[in-house]
């Protein structure tokens, strides 16, 4: 039976790949959080109307992106722990649950951001400033003219460009989070031997690798202790 090409986790290179994916998720999650914070501080806080309602673009671009970024960091940390503890089933199940939730959230975030970008491009950014410019829903009226322009606390001509400049990288980050979370799901299923990615003998190979790594770690620790003792003795002789 031919295995799916997505089931690429093996005993030789799988743990190192999982560690790299965890580090990438932590990095991408922090970048997405930063983009969401900058987007809120520079653009989207201006488009909240006085009644407390917000535009759909705000909800899609800020709330979901921030949630996806936070969860991506958590999945990355669990992936790092799982890559160093390959024989602990609870970590595998936690990784599977968090990665699956983050996969769905990242896909929803990507689709929402794509919708927000499409709507904003289609109406030329007028939907973003509709509360500040009630009369500018007419595409024939320039953004820097029309009723309500003098009451705006920000420059309406920069809202459109700034929003797109931050939304598009956030969209790419969300797509990357979805792909990395999908790999974590595959790795967790493979480690547990569940689904089409099940590999016979994988647990035995991992146990052998763990047994081989333990003497090496102990040998390295002993060598470090010997080096430290030699340095201490050399320093004592120099003082004498």
Curated annotation (Swiss-Prot):
The gene is KRTCAP3. GO terms for cellular component: membrane. PANTHER family: KERATINOCYTE-ASSOCIATED PROTEIN 3 (PTHR31258:SF1). It is a multi-pass membrane protein. Belongs to the TMEM54 family. This is Keratinocyte-associated protein 3. It comes from the Eukaryota. Keywords: Membrane, Transmembrane, Transmembrane helix. The chain crosses the membrane at residues 21-41, 63-83, 94-114, 163-183. Pfam families: BCLP. It comes from Homo sapiens (Human). Expressed in skin, pancreas and keratinocytes. It is found in: Membrane. InterPro entries: Beta-casein-like.
């Amino acid at each position: 039976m031919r295995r799916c090409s997505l089931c690429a986790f093996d005993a030789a290179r799988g743990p190192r790949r999982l560690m790299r994916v965890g580090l990438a998720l932590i990095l991408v999650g922090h970048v997405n959080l930063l983009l969401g914070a900058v987007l809120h501080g520079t653009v989207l806080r201006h488009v909240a109307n006085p009644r407390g309602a917000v535009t759909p673009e705000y909800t899609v671009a800020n709330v979901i992106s921030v949630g996806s970024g936070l969860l991506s960091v958590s999945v990355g940390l669990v992936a790092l722990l799982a890559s160093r503890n390959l024989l602990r089933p609870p970590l595998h199940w936690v990784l599977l649950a968090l990665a699956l939730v983050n996969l769905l959230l990242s896909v929803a975030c990507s689709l929402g951001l794509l919708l927000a970008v499409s709507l904003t491009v289609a109406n030329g950014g007028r939907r973003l400033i509709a509360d500040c410019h009630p009369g500018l829903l007419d595409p024939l009226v320039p953004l820097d003219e029309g009723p309500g322009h003098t009451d705006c606390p920000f420059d309406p001509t920069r809202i459109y460009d700034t929003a797109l400049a931050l939304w598009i990288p956030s969209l790419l980050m969300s797509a990357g989070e979805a792909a990395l979370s999908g790999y974590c799901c595959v790795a967790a299923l493979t480690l547990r031997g569940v689904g089409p990615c099940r590999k016979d003998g994988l647990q035995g190979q991992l146990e052998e690798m763990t047994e081989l790594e333990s003497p090496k770690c102990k040998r390295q620790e002993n060598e470090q202790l010997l080096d430290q003792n030699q340095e201490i003795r050399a320093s004592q002789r120099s003082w004498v």
